[in-house]
């Protein structure tokens, strides 16, 4: 049975860097990810969204940012300090007092052991909120996209976005800037967008057909019919691709950690070391969301360093490692 210093649950940006920083300290990590790829929401939901609020990331695409995080840790993967398991969840966890180790049963029936566990699961697993089945009739579902993986497929196509949050508005702005689509339209159920005002200001300056305060009636044969909530007037648009950005809904995947103390929002309660009510289990990122916490990629990475430093000091109490560069 494999024994690791750390089990990192969740391979979003916080979890990826958590494993990297642990490897810098010589700690071995098994990173368990319930989906088929790493990166969390930046990879799964908005890979073509640009990141500005991270040091040195001056408009880097989210997918490229995730790739850079992975490239940083590739030497540690080669050394065997970082291992990934995809499409995997933890089914059972028990703490063996005599060995001071966790024993975990995974969804593939594999058993592993670890000294510490770090929960980096964000809001838990998630999946896109999809269109209601009754709205879709005689429609090729391949033309309905809930995430964007390849922009080239939209070359000279009629695109229609559904949604009015940051993801929908920012993505359609980017496509307008790239000038690859034949036409761009956006349909939103409310009378105003739920996106940042700076993004809304941009969309109003671009050749984008906007339909606000609308109710979707039918999607059939690459046509979408919708009704104005004020006038009752119906409209029909042709599309090549329908891009749905209604947000995400959580998937419950942490049942075996329900014994840990949680707040009213189901976030794990932590101390200043990011330990949960079980001192051998840590939580970082949105899994430990607390009042006034900045919802930034940078925040999760800082929290990873706090947790890793405490774990390393606990596992290797006589190893006096520095967390800064010494001047020569």
UniProtKB/Swiss-Prot annotation:
Reactions catalysed, semicolon-separated, are: 2 reduced [2Fe-2S]-[ferredoxin] + NADP(+) + H(+) = 2 oxidized [2Fe-2S]-[ferredoxin] + NADPH
SUPFAM superfamilies given in the database record: FAD/NAD(P)-binding domain (SSF51905)
Positions that bind FAD: 14, 33, 41, 46, 90, 126
Task: Quote the cofactor binding remark.
Answer: Binds 1 FAD per subunit.
The record's keywords, sorted A to Z, are: FAD, Flavoprotein, NADP, Oxidoreductase
The reply on keyword NADP is yes
A GO term for molecular function: NADP binding
Is this entry keyworded GTP-binding? Answer: no
First-tier enzyme category under EC? oxidoreductase
Q: Which cysteines are joined by disulfide bonds?
A: none
- InterPro entries named in the record: FAD/NAD-bd_sf, FAD/NAD-binding_dom, Fd--NADP_Rdtase_type_2, Ferredoxin-NADP_redctase_2
Protein origin, superkingdom:
Bacteria
- EC number(s): the record gives 1.18.1.2
Q: Cofactor(s) for this protein?
A: FAD
Assembly state and interactors?
Answer: Homodimer.
Stated family: Belongs to the ferredoxin--NADP reductase type 2 family.
The protein's name is: Ferredoxin--NADP reductase
Q: To which species is this protein native?
A: Mycoplasmoides gallisepticum (strain R(low / passage 15 / clone 2)) (Mycoplasma gallisepticum)
Phylogenetic placement of the source organism: Bacteria, Bacillati, Mycoplasmatota, Mycoplasmoidales, Mycoplasmoidaceae
């Amino acid at each position: 049975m494999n024994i690791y210093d750390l089990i990192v649950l969740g391979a979003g940006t916080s979890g990826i860097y958590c494993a990297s920083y642990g490897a810098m300290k010589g700690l071995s990590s098994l990173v368990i990810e319930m989906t088929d790829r790493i990166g969390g929401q930046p990879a799964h939901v908005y890979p073509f969204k640009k990141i500005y609020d991270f040091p040195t990331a001056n408009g880097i695409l989210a997918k490229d940012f995730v790739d850079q995080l992975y490239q940083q840790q590739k030497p540690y993967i080669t050394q065997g300090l970082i291992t990934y398991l995809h499409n995997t969840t933890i089914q059972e966890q028990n703490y063996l007092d005599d060995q001071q180790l966790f024993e975990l049963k995974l969804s593939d029936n594999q058993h592993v052991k670890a000294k510490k566990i770090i929960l980096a699961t964000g809001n838990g697993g998630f999946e896109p909120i999809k269109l209601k089945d009754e709205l879709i009739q005689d429609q090729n579902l391949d033309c309905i996209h809930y995430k964007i993986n390849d922009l080239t497929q939209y070359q000279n196509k009629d695109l229609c976005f559904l949604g009015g949050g940051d993801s929908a508005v920012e993505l359609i702005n980017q496509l307008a800037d790239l000038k690859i689509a034949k036409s761009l339209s956006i349909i939103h159920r409310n009378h105003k967008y739920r996106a940042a005002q700076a993004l809304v200001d941009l969309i109003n300056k671009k050749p984008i057909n906007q339909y606000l305060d609308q109710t979707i009636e039918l999607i059939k044969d690459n046509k979408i019919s919708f009704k104005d909530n004020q006038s009752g007037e119906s409209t029909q648009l042709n599309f090549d691709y329908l891009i749905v950005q209604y947000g995400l809904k959580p998937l419950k995947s942490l049942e075996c950690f329900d014994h840990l103390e949680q707040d009213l929002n189901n976030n794990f309660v932590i101390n200043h070391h990011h330990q949960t009510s079980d001192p051998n289990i840590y939580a970082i990122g949105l899994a430990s969301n607390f009042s006034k916490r900045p919802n930034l990629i940078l925040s999760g990475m800082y929290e990873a360093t706090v947790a890793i430093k405490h774990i390393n000091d606990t596992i290797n109490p006589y190893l006096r490692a520095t967390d800064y560069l010494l001047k020569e």
